[in-house]
A protein has these predicted regions:
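Hydrophobic alpha-helical segments within soluble ligand-binding/sensing domains
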Residues: 163-166
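Nucleotide and nucleotide-moiety/phosphate-recognizing core
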Residues: 9, 13, 30-157, 168, ...
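Short glycine-enriched, charge-decorated loop/helix-capping segments at active-site entrances
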Residues: 154-160, 198-201
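RNase H-like, two-metal
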Residues: 21, 186-194, 200-205, 209
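Cationic, amphipathic, low-complexity alpha-helical segments enriched
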Residues: 1-31
């Protein structure tokens, strides 16, 4: 009888120990879950603190061969902004682009020139969207536009690619809800000459007109950096060349 009682007590004790072990494991899981949630919140807050007010991405083709060509209007305009703020670009591997940040009225703004060829601009824009901004509406893409004449500059809040292969690639990865600043380069005499047209330098008259368009946009740089889009549109579109 005594042996039976001892056996029963041992079983009961074993069961209690198992229950205690299970409760400890459950308690550990609850603690770990809370800890992981807290860590995630801290990481999210830190990432949000690193997000930028605006990223301005200038499209173009890298290399001396394509410097100052029609397709590189985006690059050229960003160079002017950098000059305005007396700063220089440095390569940032994380987004595979030439990159610089500027401070303006308590805001941080990035100037970005993708290192990929213009038809593959989506790669950098996808990384910009992932690491640098809260929303695609905080991205301004600067590019050439054959539907506008040299000297024309317009702002667009969203839309399609209008045949621009750089925009086409961007739309595939981040959608169409980003702002665009479009500099006119005009049409070639024949549609068949489009590919060669965009990678050639503008003639002297076109160059002067494009310089005027750059100047008009630079005159609005404060508003651009503050994302006062409607004011900019009103100014640029009401003073069309």
């Amino acid at each position: 009888m005594q042996e039976v009682e001892q056996c029963f007590l041992k079983m009961k004790l074993r069961k209690m120990l198992m229950l205690l072990k299970v409760k400890r494991q459950q308690h550990r899981k609850v603690i770990m879950k809370k800890l992981l949630k807290k860590i995630s919140q801290i990481i999210l807050r830190r990432n949000q603190n690193k997000l930028l007010h605006l990223c301005i991405v200038g499209l173009g083709n890298p290399g001396d061969k394509y410097s100052k060509t029609r397709h590189n209007a985006g690059y050229d305009f960003l160079d002017l902004i950098a000059k305005e703020f007396n700063t220089d670009f440095k390569y940032l591997k994380k987004i595979d682009a030439d990159y610089v940040e500027i401070d303006f009225e308590d805001h941080k703004i990035a100037l970005i020139k993708p290192r990929e060829f213009i038809n593959r601009s989506g790669k950098t824009l996808q990384l910009v969207r992932k690491y640098k901004v809260k929303d695609t509406k905080d991205i301004l893409v600067v590019h050439d536009d054959m539907d506008l004449e040299p000297g024309d500059v317009k702002l667009k809040l969203s839309g399609g690619h209008a045949g621009h292969n750089g925009l086409r690639d961007i739309l595939k990865v981040i959608g169409n809800e980003f702002v665009r600043l479009r500099f006119g380069i005009g049409h070639p005499p024949n549609k068949e000459q489009t590919d060669s047209w965009v990678i050639k330098k503008p003639n002297p008259e076109e160059k002067r007109e494009m310089a005027n368009a750059f100047e008009r946009a630079i005159n609005n740089i404060d508003k651009i950096l503050l994302k006062d889009w409607m004011i900019i549109m009103n100014d640029l579109h009401s003073n069309e060349h």
